[in-house]
């Protein structure tokens, strides 16, 4: 194996992967620098989710390599990849997948609680993120009492609460109305920038690219284009105490 470029915190080389014999990735390569926001755009079925799952260690590609901080991920055993995801990565998908028996703040704080952070400290950090996502007033509610847009914001808070090195966001605003979608993406990307987090943000909406530094466009499992975003939307400034 040839080591990836030193300035890439996340790197993939010629990834190939199939689902039940159907090709999902056909030789995709990408590098992401520390603190960078990369938008992965393309229509449904283009390979976006498969790429994010390979990069985050959820899937081992059929062929190709995945590296994080200069160490190979694709050769690690399942337990090591699970540990990497818990300790260094955050994930939010298009479905919130909240635990119904937990309140909003407990769901948001779950990554911290699983790491042994005391309940009071975990709750305070979760509340901060819920407030930033305009869902703080519902912190004590269970998912069944929340609107769809509110549940999705709780899921975003959960992905950010532990300040992971990399946040993988797989079409996180897909189920939301346009105004809610824009607010969630602005908050996600501005919070990541203020904390130095790297983000890989997938979306079917071309507007997703407005929030990123670079865009990787996929189609039919292949790279269609890779460009820098010249006129991305300027994110809202982060609070001074963030």
For the regions a language model picked out, list residue spans one by one.
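Conserved ABC transporter NBD signature motif
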Residues: 64-72
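Conserved ABC ATPase "signature" region
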Residues: 121-138
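Conserved ABC ATPase signature
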Residues: 142-146, 150
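Conserved catalytic motifs of ABC-family nucleotide-binding domains
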Residues: 163
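Short coil-to-helix segment of the ABC ATPase nucleotide-binding domain corresponding to the Q-loop/switch region
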Residues: 102-110
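Helix-to-loop junction immediately C-terminal to a conserved catalytic motif
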Residues: 56
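ABC ATPase NBD coupling module
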Residues: 73-90
